[in-house]
Regions:
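Internal alpha-helical scaffold/solenoid segments in large eukaryotic proteins
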Residues: 288-290, 307, 316, 340, ...
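A structural signal for leucine-rich repeat
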Residues: 164-167, 236-240, 264-272, 291-301, ...
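Short, solvent-exposed loop/turn at the beta-strand->alpha-helix junction
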Residues: 49-50, 63, 75-78, 131, ...
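Positions within ordered alpha-helical repeat solenoids
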Residues: 45, 49, 71, 75, ...
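Conserved hydrophobic beta-strand positions in leucine-rich repeat
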Residues: 94, 149, 247-254, 277-281, ...
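Cullin-RING E3 adaptor/co-adaptor recruitment helices
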Residues: 2-258
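C-terminal capping region of solenoid repeat domains
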Residues: 1-22, 26-29, 409, 413-414, ...
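Short, flexible/disordered secondary-structure transition segments
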Residues: 53-58, 76, 80-84, 96, ...
Length: 529
């Protein structure tokens, strides 16, 4: 059970709410490029190798060099040195994304699930260490000056969210206790002196406090899926809105999964809309009626730039009307995921009233009809689209409109995914010319479409000739599969297919760097002619 939950969290840190810096290089593990380090960075790297050495150094170095030490400790995962640095942090604030290398970069996470898992683990390591160490420093009354911890841009594990929320409530309850104790002591001081009588004088009381008497703020990206964390977070967000709260939690992104409409209503009402920029409500089993109830609450979050409503049940006219009304209230929204909501024939109704232009649009398994693709090809969003995913829709009947759509976004589109779109040879021959004219395309996914080897070669020639292409995901050609041949011959055919693809790629690219090819099985064998 624990393993599946962990896997679920890793799978969730991607998509609309977690944008990739596609133009930056991979920044983790074997993919990370080595850069020439400055003398300051080399010295900092040496110091943080030993926590005791770090503890000695922070007593003498100028405060601005603490930043270099923290950067080195984060980069090399020196947890004990990080603890020392936070306990002696000389500044009022610490912003993680200014210190740690950005991990959500390049197109690699789009096709390499192992790499995605690695960068999420590394991100969770950063936020876990900082959160725990920060609270421990407060409880131990260390000489840190840190009052504002910003961990946005890096995922926070649900267990850490629960840990922070419980401490937020602990600080609130202790503050209330302190107020009551002070009131009691004032009353005791006003009582007449009992020394001349036989009665004993009331004793003054003291209040124990875990956190210093000041105001501290933790800003983060939260993931919540359990009832226990949901309940604790709702209470913590409620008290965080009080002006005199000692420990406040602020959310910039929220991923709320498997909670349902009623719990979402309660949670969303506690969040300050001033700060929330990304919201993911995937797998909440929202029916049409549920979404109509939830939509007015969502309209509060007018600063959202990313919204993920995938894997719910938004399909009928009323819910699509509510969705369209909601989107018209989100002027800054540029990233949207409606996957696995059957909005067939209603895409114009949903997207046409938006005041903003979408840069990211994911419509996987939405049952798109020809009219939907036709709308997309002429909509105001086409001028700004950078990432588009139309996978698991039958695009074969919409070949002409698909060609028009690709032509309209040829100068802006960076990633294009059309996996399992039932595309056949004739359609791909038609759109290959459009693919060859894509000016900024970096990643394309055409896997699980039933294409012959000759058409694969034709499309390959168009795609790998693009100057910006970095990765291309495709299935083996349908020629590789037949019920009449033994397994070893299928393997030979697949090897031949791979060889032909690389031959075409080398003929087109010459001595230039070759893009990465990802071959996968053609799963939909029932579509093979």
């Amino acid at each position: 059970m624990q393993t599946s939950q962990t896997s679920l969290q890793y799978d969730h840190y991607q998509g609309a709410v977690y944008p990739l810096d596609l133009h930056a290089d991979p920044n983790h593990g074997q993919f990370r490029k080595t850069h020439i380090k400055s003398l300051v960075n080399l010295c900092a790297e040496y110091i943080v190798r030993d926590a005791s050495f770090t503890r000695e150094a922070v007593q003498h170095i100028p405060y601005h060099l603490s930043v270099a030490l923290m950067q080195a400790a984060l980069l090399d995962n020196r947890d004990r040195s990080m603890e020392t640095l936070i306990s002696h942090w000389p500044l009022n604030s610490l912003t993680l994304k200014k210190l740690a290398p950005s991990l959500f970069t390049s197109v690699v996470p789009l096709y390499n699930s192992t790499y995605l898992t690695d960068i999420v683990r590394q991100s969770l390591r950063y936020t876990t260490c900082l959160s725990h160490t920060f609270l421990e420093c407060l409880k131990k009354r260390t000489p840190t000056k840190l009052k504002y911890l910003d961990m946005t841009g890096f995922p926070t594990a649900e267990v850490i969210l629960f840990y922070l929320a419980t401490h937020c409530m602990l600080a609130h309850n202790e503050a209330r206790q302190t107020v009551m104790v002070n009131m009691y002591n004032r009353v005791v001081n006003l009582l007449p002196d009992q020394t001349q009588s036989n009665e004993s004088s009331p004793q003054l009381m003291t209040a124990d406090t875990t956190i210093p008497d000041s105001s501290f703020t933790v800003k983060m990206d939260a993931f919540v899926t359990s009832d226990q964390t949901h309940a604790e977070l709702c209470k913590a967000l409620k008290v965080s809105g009080f002006q005199d709260s000692k420990l406040k939690i602020v959310l910039e992104k929220l991923d709320a999964t498997c909670l349902g409409e009623q719990k979402l209503q309660i949670l969303l009402q506690q969040i300050n809309p001033k700060f929330l920029q990304g919201l993911r409500l995937k797998y909440n089993a929202l029916s049409c009626e549920d979404f109509c109830k939830l939509s007015p609450v969502l309209e509060r979050f007018d600063r959202l730039t990313a919204l993920d409503l995938s894997c719910n049940n938004i399909r009928h006219k009323d819910s699509c009307d509510s969705l369209a009304h909601l989107l018209s209230f989100l002027p800054h929204l540029i990233r949207l995921d409606l996957s696995n909501n059957r909005v067939k024939t209603r895409l114009r109704q949903v997207l046409s009233n938006m005041t903003s232009t979408l840069q990211y649009l994911r419509l996987v398994a939405c049952g798109l009809a020809l009219t939907d693709v036709a709308y997309l090809s002429v909509s105001h969003h086409i001028s700004g689209l950078q990432e588009l995913d139309l996978s698991e829709n039958n695009l074969q009947p919409a070949a002409a409109n698909l060609s028009k759509l690709l032509k309209g976004c040829k100068s802006t589109l960076h990633t294009l995914e059309m996996e399992d779109c039932k595309l056949r040879d004739d359609t791909m021959e038609m759109v290959a010319g459009n693919l060859a004219s894509m000016e900024t395309l970096m990643y394309m996914n055409l896997s699980d479409n039933s294409l012959s080897l000759s058409v694969h070669e034709f499309v390959m020639e168009a795609v790998v000739g693009l100057p910006s292409i970095q990765a291309y995901r495709l299935s083996f050609s349908k020629d590789c599969y037949s019920a009449d041949i033994p397994d070893y011959q299928q393997v030979m055919r697949k090897d031949f297919c791979v060889g032909q693809m690389y031959r075409v790629m080398r003929n087109v690219r010459g001595e230039a760097t070759l893009p990465h090819l990802i071959f996968v099985e053609l799963e939909r064998l029932d579509y093979v002619e």
